Amino acid sequence: MFRMSRSVYVFGARCVILFALFPLLSWPAWGENRLLALQKDVPLHPAVTAFFSNDDEFISEVVIPSMERERKDEIHLKIVSSDGAPLQTCQVSAELQKLEFHFGHCNLATEKSSRNRHLLSSLFHFTCPENLTKWKNYAPDLGVYDFSKIDSMVDYCDANEINIEWHFLSGYHPEWFTSLQTDAEKAASQLANSRAVLNRYQDSVNFFQVFNEDWHTHIERAKVFCDQTELFKTLRKEFPKVELGVCDCWSFNKENRLPSVEEVMSRYPGINFVSMHAHKPRRLWASPKEMFDTFEQYKDSDIKIHVTEFGIIKGEIEGVYRTGDWDDATLAEYFVQVAATAFSHPSVRVLNLWANYDKFTGNRLFGEDGKPTELYEALNSLLNHKLTTHVTGETDENGACVFSGFHGRYKLKVKSSSGRLFTAQFDVGRKATHAKLVINEVEGTAHVTID
């Protein structure tokens, strides 16, 4: 599509220092009381080590610095008493519980095996279901809905803090849809279904794909029978607070690149996100630069990119970046690369894996014996051992401390000078990096406020 010099991407890389495990004490740096970073005593998977020590300069000079710059911040903590007095020399520990970035799986909330669902939930906290929210699966007749299975999924996701993307409002068409005589009737039915779903789930589902596979690709069962721009404008006006997007079979190769920001905004006024399948060509090993080139045009826009159907079919590797065959080792390497590279780009908000068992033979996270595959172990190493933050130390004379950490939800443990242990959770993001923990020793309570 276009070529960019490396200078477009390269900015000053943040120096990240990982300390070994020390006793609880403060570390003086830059005039601030810095907490010490703790390393997990677990060796990284070879695929993770291979990516972060790769001799591809684009990874070392662009991807990794972008990850440090875009997904981390200096997080400032202050510990005070209920009357506002700073609490000095409190022992402090903060550990990342969940990344702000949405790593997901299509079967996270629908997996039938309780064991496998537990294993999935230790990696992911987002789902774009493969089939459950398609129109044909909850509308047995015109104007008749059976949302019982979706309600159960939504309840499960709410209880387990799993975010949901609806796939998708305008299709696939139910069987009875073909009996409608005119395009006008079909258009009215698609609008009515969109309204029914949004009215029911606008407060419990995070993202809604309005259309899928009827722009870049044209699938008959996904065909939209009304003016797409007008339908989108109608839903945007009626549901102003809902996150609306579109989905299609866009990918990382030049033939399937995302449309321009200008095209998307003109076609879908008020759009919040675009969801790309990223599974064609079926055996493509895209380079990190090809991935960045796909994402980069959205960098300065408010439209986020969701990679919602990522998958590989085994066979001979396609593309020029790597050659050979897809096997356990190469799949582990590529999925780590895709996850880390998507995570590093500020335009991307979601990476959702597709089709665990069927067509996408390269996506299997569990073997025939039910045990986690090499791919699962590699993703577990990346998400739970590499992209994590765990720090410890003490507050200074101002009750303050600071650390560098990934954006997400943290569990904070504070032991006051009285020896009492207090725990709390708080969320850190780009615009929320200052947290104050207020401790009430008398009542034994603690709560966090974010500035």
Regions inferred by a protein language model and the residue ranges of each:
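Bacterial N-terminal signal peptides
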Residues: 15-26
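Beta-strand-rich domain onsets/edges
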Residues: 33-107, 135-138, 226, 244-245, ...
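Aromatic-rich peripheral "rim/lid" segments of glycoside hydrolase catalytic domains that contact
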Residues: 45-48, 200, 209, 214-220, ...
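N-terminal substrate-binding region of glycoside hydrolase catalytic domains
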Residues: 43-45, 97-151, 156, 162-163, ...
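Conserved, mostly hydrophobic/aromatic
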Residues: 77, 127, 157, 208, ...
